[in-house]
Amino acid sequence: MGSKTLPAPVPIHPSLQLTNYSFLQAVNGLPTVPSDHLPNLYGFSALHAVHLHQWTLGYPAMHLPRSSFSKVPGAVSSLVDARFQLPAFPWFPHVIQPKPEITAGGSGPAALKTKPRFDFANLALAATQEDPSKLGRGEGPGSPAGGLGALLDVTKLSPEKKPTRGRLPSKTKKEFVCKFCGRHFTKSYNLLIHERTHTDERPYTCDICHKAFRRQDHLRDHRYIHSKEKPFKCQECGKGFCQSRTLAVHKTLHSQVKELKTSKIKC
């Protein structure tokens, strides 16, 4: 009975264009090579089919024992070169060029450790604990990965320590302290006017009556007394006032009179 070969697998991803699929079909049609010529290469087309299927699905490469594929007789290699060109990807990259993976405990495939699956049931516990695999590899604060982890720890800060989003930290307001009584002011002008109450300094003097004032706006309001024009007039009685605050007090008198009249009418 002749040797049976596995059929070529059909790719499950139609969008992926496999240029080596025709190459696999051509390899399946190669004549059977005696086992004494290929002592360590068993089922060439079958192994290649499995490898291509894993390469198509994106699975990790199989760890197969090192074979003597590089010692294939010239008859087979000449047959392969005559019929088609070599594929774009290596036939057995994990065999021809093994990737050295050395861990802290040893070297070789025996020292490889698979990462455990993430447990969503213990999500809060996993977020607070350190990863033992990272500690074994020496990812401390001095390493690049440790520095990145230190930057990511900013997200674990308490709400009091987190920087405000969208707002810059408020500047400290300047305080002006009175040297006489120790009262605080946020503006230097207010402190200047306040200190004049202690020193009784009145730099603004009326030209007509020579009355002095601590503030310039007070002198301005005083000058309306000497002039016939009163800038603030009552709309009900027509009486004029030099200051707006005296007009506001005058309006309260009119409102009180109106309330008394309405209360008498109800009675």
Curated annotation (Swiss-Prot):
Tell me one GO molecular function of this protein. Answer: RNA polymerase II transcription regulatory region sequence-specific DNA binding
Sorted alphabetically, the keyword list is: Metal-binding, Methylation, Nucleus, Repeat, Transcription, Transcription regulation, Zinc, Zinc-finger
Q: Asymmetric dimethylarginine (modified residue): where? A: 117
Bias class Gly residues marks the residues at: 138-149
Gene Ontology CC entries for this record: nucleus
Instruction: Fetch the SUPFAM superfamilies from UniProt.
Output: beta-beta-alpha zinc fingers
Q: Where are the zinc-finger regions (C2H2-type) in this chain?
A: 176-198, 204-226, 232-254
| SMART domains, alphabetized | ZnF_C2H2
Location of this chain's protein in the cell: Nucleus
Could you say which residues form the signal peptide?
A: none
Q: What does this protein do?
A: Transcription factor that plays a role in the regulation of embryonic heart and urogenital development.
Q: Which PANTHER family match?
A: ODD-SKIPPED - RELATED (PTHR14196), PROTEIN ODD-SKIPPED-RELATED 1 (PTHR14196:SF5)
| Descriptive protein name | Protein odd-skipped-related 1
Source organism per UniProt: Bos taurus (Bovine)
